[in-house]
Amino acid sequence: AQDSCSHRCGELLGTCSCQATCQSLGICCPDYKEFCLQISPYSGSLMGGKDFLIENTAFNASSVITCRFKQKIKTRGYVAKDGKAHCISPLLYETGFIPFEVSADDGLMFPYSGTWLSVHHNKVSDAEKCTLVNETKWQYYGTPNTDGNLTLTWTQQTLATTHINIEVWGYQETGDSYSENWLAEWTYLYTLAREIPNTGKFSFIPVPAKGNYSTWDFGILRITPSNYSDGQRQIYFWAFFFSSNIPSIWSSEHALAWHLGKDFRNDPAAWATAKCIEWDRKEEKLPNFIEEIIDCPCTLAQARADTGRFHTDYGCDIEKGSVCTYHPGAVHCVRAVQASRQFGAGQQCCYDSAGTQILTRDSTGGSTPDRGHDWGSPPFMKPPRIPGFSHWLYDVVSFYYCCLWSDNCHVYMKRRPSSDCRTYRPPHAASAFGDPHFFTFDGLNFTFKGQGEYTLVESDLTSLRVQGRTQQARFPNGTQAQVTSLSAVAMQENSSDVIEVRYSQDLNLEVLLNQKVISFSEQSWMDLKGLFLHSTADQNITVMFSSGSGVEIRGSGGFLTLTVLLPEKFMNHTQGLFGVMNGHIEDEYTFKNKTTLSVHASPQELFEFGANWAVENGTSLFTYDTEFLLDNFFYGEKHNASFLPVFFPYEDPADPLVTEMVLVCDSDPFCRFDVLTTRSLQVGSSTRLAHQNHKLLVESLKPVISCGWLDHPTNGQKNGTKYLLGSTISFTCDQGYELTGSKERICQVTGAWSGDTPSC
């Protein structure tokens, strides 16, 4: 009998395949599309309640659909009039791709399978959430000068129903901090409005919540069709966890000022002060996470260049007009991508318009570290690693208590002081671009135009591997040129997911996750195994591995540009075309057997060096999902020894292209080289830009010396908030006091301040 994909998606069977690559290779089992599910939409908030369609499988109208996530969380599905099945996503305490299966016989067998992308609650589109109109009013309700109506709006088409309920849910974490019994829980509290028309708008005058509900100060609203019972989510059925999730629209999570009790409304500042002091006492007993988090980059330039370890904080983004509500005076903030190892804590770094780091000791606009990383951290599921909500509980609600609802911000800043940058070490960068020109970690550059698949960098420190494929470039008229360009890059670290970025044959940029092409149409950010993946609107792809290493890939006209960023700990732990990262260029051209070539080697000798780093089928990370790739790269040679490139292109003064080339390239040798070998000014122009970007990156990543923060003397002032090499801080005393010690101190090359501590 022919093999079947029932229960077998992702496997290669005896006679056919149930893997994603089977479609382009034409080797799928006949029932591949029936059992291996395509869904739309493919992502939704971790809060659940999102209806998604199973596109490729038809079911009987009488089928009883059950959807099961992670092999244990079950939700009810249904068959629509068109015969297509739908599932409802469950409440999950994690982000990332979640495997799910579908049963059509009320849960006896689950032969169908697919994956659902669970995302951070702030990363779903606005249309999927209901909007707290004038959100500040909701979060300050009951404080002086904030009263009257509150309004909620939503997209009414999202729920196919005439009447809705609006529920209030609260979030809490119970048990002992940092212990096995520390648990996260969303709880249905009460129904705010029942059976109201689904018009897309609701206004009300809030009253303090009844009973002990008003003790919940952090939560969320949920809109559901009114034909379900209140708060319906889970029914415990024997030993099975059967969750009857229902279609829902959630609001953004927020401080529940508007439903707090009379004690809050009568004297909000006193109530908040008591809460702030209580939080401070709790923090006193918790372990110090600040010693564990990475230091901030010293300058805005470093922060924006270190893309493997830091990513834009969407709450303060220079590319979106610097709307920095929580950080007055800042123009840009970044967050450390990885949570700290033991405590799952997060780092944040903010900068002013001069590019200088803003510290909380100087300004309330300073950056504050987080006991709970805002994005959560693997393995999720338990505090302090719950995406978004753990962070709200320890770092945001407490900010409301101390800074926004009362005047005790000094208490908050004492527990969340900015880290300075004295221990920050910038990463080292290597790049490849154009008709491949390579810039190594130690700053050597060379051109290697082999055709094949090569190890760009590998490291024994974290089993990091980045591999590049080069293909023959084409002239503008379509014929093949005697040069190559980078057409695909594949990478993995330890046992992480494998990411590949490549140009397809029709020159579309594709990103593959474990051999499957993925779409960024709904989500530009993905939390994956061992890495984060980000794509900008113009297809700049960034991979951030858990070690802090980063890979950036951009495409232009069939040529890939690649940058790899490695933190200092990779020193003396790299090999491949990008060289041995150790600060010396003499050993850049090191072969697999550890012999080296002179740095003055000829292009022909460098061709030998490059060929030595060809990958083997056993260690290749690439996906071979077309006849062309199989023939040329899988069954063919990994390094095409018969392909001989142009080593020295001829510059003919009578060639009209040369005149134009000078205008485009100026004196850039790589640009000139690529124009002559590809006959394309556009390729030359992209090469020049990539070369300039690399030089700029290396410049931005130069180490900066910091002498650390200086305090003002008691009964005196200080002038200046820059603490980097060459900065001067001057001191004066209040009237009636005299200064002893240094009037001004300068940050010296040793990392120490000149002079002595002043006092008044």
Predicted regions and their residues:
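Extracellular, cysteine-rich, disulfide-stabilized repeat modules with beta-strand cores
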Residues: 10-12, 16, 20-30, 286-290, ...
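Short, disulfide-bonded extracellular cysteine-rich repeat modules
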Residues: 17, 23-36, 344-350, 413-423, ...
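Beta-strand/beta-sandwich contexts
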Residues: 36-60, 115-151
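Short, solvent-exposed loop/edge segments of extracellular or virion-exposed proteins
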Residues: 45, 434, 439-440, 708-718
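Immunoglobulin-like IPT/TIG beta-sandwich domains and homologous Ig-like subdomains
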Residues: 45-107, 162-209
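Short edge beta-strand/loop segments characteristic of extracellular beta-sandwich folds
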Residues: 50-57, 88, 151-157, 730-734
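Von Willebrand factor type D
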Residues: 125-703
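Conserved N-terminal submotifs of small, disulfide-stabilized extracellular modules
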Residues: 702-760
